[in-house]
């Protein structure tokens, strides 16, 4: 060990050309550009999200609720974007991944909100030991789960988000993407969709 420590450190080669061609920051910026082309005002909140997956999901859900009440600075149509990689502390023996768990934890907060959609996906197309990259949930997900007798808190305590989300067709399956620059989370908020929903129900 001492011999290795005392050895000269490698020097930069004069003919070396190092370029970063992909990063989580670039991923978020690309997502922001896509959102903008679809008419959403993008906000990149963080590219280093690294908390407990369930807490991140609840955070996104609370953002949506605050926006719905008109108590946030977000405009009527926006995309709230984050990048990073959350963690899961296992308490059960179910099947799932951090992105699926994040999305499921947001479900109770989004319940009944026709103007909010949350997507959480891995850039490599893999989320935990599953074939899914992540999940997409909205204001109808909670009721659809409840109709099947599936309760979010029970599922989360068993870390079984995969099977619950599979039952309501909320998994995002892309297959391997050939890259890996952490995960992408985006919350789409659109007040106009609420107005359209009210018109249809009138």
Language-model region placement:
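Structural signal for hydrophobic packing residues in well-ordered secondary-structure cores
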Residues: 9, 31-39, 60, 64-71, ...
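Accessory alpha-helical/coil subdomains and C-terminal extensions
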Residues: 1-63
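Flexible, glycine/charged-enriched surface loops at secondary-structure junctions
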Residues: 1-8, 38-48, 69-79, 114-121, ...
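Conserved mixed alpha/beta catalytic, RNA-binding, or beta-rich assembly cores of soluble enzyme
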Residues: 76-115
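Internal helix-turn-beta structural module
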Residues: 105-196, 201-202
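A short beta-alpha structural unit
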Residues: 18-19, 46-54, 79-91, 123-127
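Short glycine/threonine-rich loop-to-helix capping motif typified by GTGT followed
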Residues: 53-63, 69, 88-102, 128-136
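Predominant activation on well-ordered alpha-helical scaffold segments within soluble catalytic domains
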Residues: 28-32, 36, 54-61, 65, ...
